[in-house]
Amino acid sequence: MNGDDAFARRPTVGAQIPEKIQKAFDDIAKYFSKEEWEKMKASEKIFYVYMKRKYEAMTKLGFKATLPPFMCNKRAEDFQGNDLDNDPNRGNQVERPQMTFGRLQGISPKIMPKKPAEEGNDSEEVPEASGPQNDGKELCPPGKPTTSEKIHERSGPKRGEHAWTHRLRERKQLVIYEEISDPEEDDE
């Protein structure tokens, strides 16, 4: 089994909590008062452990993730003079796109619509590259569609169409169907 699933298994009453889980709980406990922590169920504690792990994983990947709400209070206390002055990564941070926990799965590039051609110019401009490889040659001839245009031509069904409509094809040969009678009907 996966080691991260250790939190999902609930320890039996009187059993010792494994050291790994206890350490994770201790990391989270510092964000809550003692009364809040003792009132919390084990499932809530596990939820906060996973939330903190997600936040740390996203920041390691370079995303500027929103700080989980339970961590905001502690971060505000740190800002008043504790750890932020001694943080070695503080000056080395690079501006990255801001992500929230739920949006990580739905990452997709935004496609901007093409601007309409000006009235006086009917032909589309083709980008040119200069350099030793191309020497001013056109990247794509004006008559042929680009790869992105081909993709957009073959894209899936439009809104309102049935999902399988674009996959249906006509038969090349005519098929003749015969009606088959049931043997029970013939007996009567």
UniProtKB/Swiss-Prot annotation:
<comment type="function">
    <text>Could act as a modulator of transcription.</text>
</comment>
<protein>
    <recommendedName>
        <fullName>Protein SSX2</fullName>
    </recommendedName>
</protein>
<dbReference type="GO" id="GO:0005634">
    <property type="term" value="C:nucleus"/>
</dbReference>
<keyword id="KW-0539">Nucleus</keyword>
<dbReference type="InterPro" id="IPR001909">
    <property type="entry name" value="KRAB"/>
</dbReference>
<keyword id="KW-0804">Transcription</keyword>
<dbReference type="InterPro" id="IPR036051">
    <property type="entry name" value="KRAB_dom_sf"/>
</dbReference>
<dbReference type="GO" id="GO:0006355">
    <property type="term" value="P:regulation of DNA-templated transcription"/>
</dbReference>
<feature type="compositionally biased region" description="Basic and acidic residues">
    <location>
        <begin position="147"/>
        <end position="164"/>
    </location>
</feature>
<feature type="region of interest" description="Disordered">
    <location>
        <begin position="76"/>
        <end position="188"/>
    </location>
</feature>
<comment type="similarity">
    <text>Belongs to the SSX family.</text>
</comment>
<dbReference type="InterPro" id="IPR019041">
    <property type="entry name" value="SSXRD_motif"/>
</dbReference>
<feature type="domain" description="KRAB-related">
    <location>
        <begin position="20"/>
        <end position="83"/>
    </location>
</feature>
<feature type="region of interest" description="Interaction with RAB3IP">
    <location>
        <begin position="25"/>
        <end position="80"/>
    </location>
</feature>
<feature type="modified residue" description="Phosphoserine">
    <location>
        <position position="123"/>
    </location>
</feature>
<keyword id="KW-0160">Chromosomal rearrangement</keyword>
<feature type="modified residue" description="Phosphoserine">
    <location>
        <position position="108"/>
    </location>
</feature>
<comment type="subunit">
    <text>Interacts via its N-terminal region with RAB3IP and SSX2IP.</text>
</comment>
<feature type="site" description="Breakpoint for translocation to form the SSXT-SSX2 fusion protein (rare)">
    <location>
        <begin position="68"/>
        <end position="69"/>
    </location>
</feature>
<dbReference type="Pfam" id="PF09514">
    <property type="entry name" value="SSXRD"/>
</dbReference>
<feature type="region of interest" description="Interaction with SSX2IP">
    <location>
        <begin position="1"/>
        <end position="80"/>
    </location>
</feature>
<keyword id="KW-0656">Proto-oncogene</keyword>
<dbReference type="InterPro" id="IPR003655">
    <property type="entry name" value="aKRAB"/>
</dbReference>
<feature type="site" description="Breakpoint for translocation to form the SSXT-SSX2 fusion protein">
    <location>
        <begin position="110"/>
        <end position="111"/>
    </location>
</feature>
<feature type="compositionally biased region" description="Acidic residues">
    <location>
        <begin position="179"/>
        <end position="188"/>
    </location>
</feature>
<keyword id="KW-0805">Transcription regulation</keyword>
<keyword id="KW-0597">Phosphoprotein</keyword>
<dbReference type="Pfam" id="PF01352">
    <property type="entry name" value="KRAB"/>
</dbReference>
